[in-house]
């Protein structure tokens, strides 16, 4: 049985990723994708689980020594979660690219090479290239979405937020990971779900996985 491509919902903080994941979950609970393959498994809360388990806080993200350790643990946890879904297809809230992008932003390129040279990144990158990557866009248009929940790291300002989005997309481009940007102008929940599904179905039907 040929499984459909995995879906990764990624990008900067406060861009609607978790809301989109929840809406995709509701969609697949109500609509079976096909009799040929099962509904997706969902990978969620990886970073938050690492923060809690290893007693990190959001402020540690900007402390280089702590941040590199944190992002390495998140990368390991993401790889482990994906391995557990090896016989299924999944939708992931974030990806292995997210911790590396944060390391590039707050630790630096030289130290981040330790993550890029890891077996986990090689494994995850290969899987991501076969999947569907949706980057939720950070932009001035979405400024009202910025909300501090007390757990996530907040950007200094809109420019910092948008700069991280640009860094993220540039990183994906550099590593040959195809992706599509979901703009905030598509704001309705149903429209955002349809955007993801349209791209996912197109990739599955084209056999480009």
Where are these regions (language model features)?
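A glycine- and Lys/Arg-enriched "phosphate-lid" helix/loop adjacent to the NTP-binding pocket
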Residues: 107-173, 180-187
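Hydrophobic positions on the alpha1 helix immediately C-terminal to the Walker A/P-loop
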Residues: 20
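The conserved Walker
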Residues: 13
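Phosphate-binding P-loop
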Residues: 1-4
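Conserved substrate/cofactor phosphate-moiety recognition/catalytic segment
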Residues: 26-77
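Glycine-rich phosphate-binding loop used to anchor ATP phosphates in small-molecule kinases
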Residues: 69-128
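Conserved lysine of the Walker
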Residues: 17
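Hydrophobic anchor at the beta1->P-loop junction of P-loop NTPases
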Residues: 9
């Amino acid at each position: 049985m040929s499984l459909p491509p995995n879906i990764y919902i990624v990008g900067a903080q406060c861009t609607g990723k978790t809301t989109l994941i929840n809406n995709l979950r509701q969609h697949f609970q109500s609509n079976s994708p096909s009799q040929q393959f099962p509904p997706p498994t969902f990978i969620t809360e990886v970073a938050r689980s690492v923060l809690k388990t290893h007693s990190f806080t959001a402020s540690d993200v900007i402390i280089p020594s702590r941040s590199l350790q944190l992002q390495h643990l998140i990368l390991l946890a993401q790889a482990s979660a994906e391995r557990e879904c090896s016989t299924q297809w999944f939708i992931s809230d974030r990806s292995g690219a997210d911790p590396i992008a944060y390391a590039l932003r707050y630790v630096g390129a030289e130290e981040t090479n330790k993550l890029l040279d890891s077996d986990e990144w090689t494994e995850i990158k290969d899987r991501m290239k076969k999947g569907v990557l949706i980057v939720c866009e950070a932009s001035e248009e979405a400024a009202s979405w910025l909300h501090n929940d007390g757990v996530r790291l907040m950007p200094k300002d809109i420019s910092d937020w948008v700069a991280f989005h640009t860094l993220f997309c540039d990183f994906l481009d550099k590593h040959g990971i195809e992706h599509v940007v979901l703009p905030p102008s598509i704001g309705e929940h149903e429209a955002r779900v349809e955007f993801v599904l349209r791209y996912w179905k197109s990739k599955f039907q084209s056999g480009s996985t």
